[in-house]
Amino acid sequence: MRSNLPLNALRAFEASARHLSFTRAALELCVTQAAVSQQVRILEDRLNRVLFKRLPRGLEMTDEAQALFAVLTDAFGQIDTIFRQFEGGEYREVLTVAAVGTFAVGWLLPRIEQFRQAHPFVELRLRTNNNVVNLAAEGLDFAIRFGNGLWPATHNEMLFEAPLTVLCTPETAQRLRRPADLLQENLLRSYRVDEWDNWFAAAGVTAERINGAVFDSSRLMVETVIHTGGAALVPAVMFARELAAGQLVRPFDIEIQMGYWLTHLKSKPMTPAMEIFRDWIVKMA
């Protein structure tokens, strides 16, 4: 029989570790900051270990705390999954997938109904993000990411290639005779700061510092280009409609190889719902 586990203390610790703040943990748990701090002290006394360094601007986990947090994140995630599977009085497999917004809008959402019709017992919960995810902390089964597939601690399977290329309006393209002419235009950037540098290097152009606005969405960049001009370095495959309509053109053929990837934690066993979704999306891609 298990010894008495300090469940309230573990819950307070997990929330504090996730937020790195007793105050934000207290707001989440609907208790006082003092109550959270006391529960963490109880856990520290129980383990005979210091779990947090109390700093002026927040908390910092010790090595012991990081090890405990990893275990609790997984355990609480599994408990939450089981509860969600029985919501509504019937059993359903819950599958939580995060996707970059451009992929979600441009590829996944138009196909979601096909998945639901084929697999009605799988409740797909879709989140969007800007490609920065923490699968364990966010309780994700899969994340669909854009890049080169070199992410640690995850199994990464390419869905399809989506090379980065320059898109602009036909009016802007008339001013572009060679790649270096782009340096006279407003170059919109993603948070991946080296993309334009890599593109110009592939074009044989030495670029000065690029200071265009930074976006966390390729789709938002493209909408900005259409309405205000400039040029964006984006996966053209996701903007076939705008290209076909003549709203956008590709002034140059130079590309940076990238792709969309289905990723999941190597440490997370595949559930039946995960296997179903993986087989479906790979086939559809």
Curated annotation (Swiss-Prot):
Residues 22-41 bind DNA. One of its GO terms (cellular component) is cytoplasm. GO terms for molecular function: DNA-binding transcription factor activity; sequence-specific DNA binding. GO terms for biological process: DNA-templated transcription. Its main location: cytoplasm. Keywords: Activator, Cytoplasm, DNA-binding, Transcription, Transcription regulation. The keyword Cytoplasm applies. This protein is a positive regulator of gene expression of beta-lactamase (AmpC). Belongs to the LysR transcriptional regulatory family. This is HTH-type transcriptional activator AmpR. It comes from Citrobacter koseri (Citrobacter diversus). The lineage of its organism: Bacteria, Pseudomonadati, Pseudomonadota, Gammaproteobacteria, Enterobacterales.
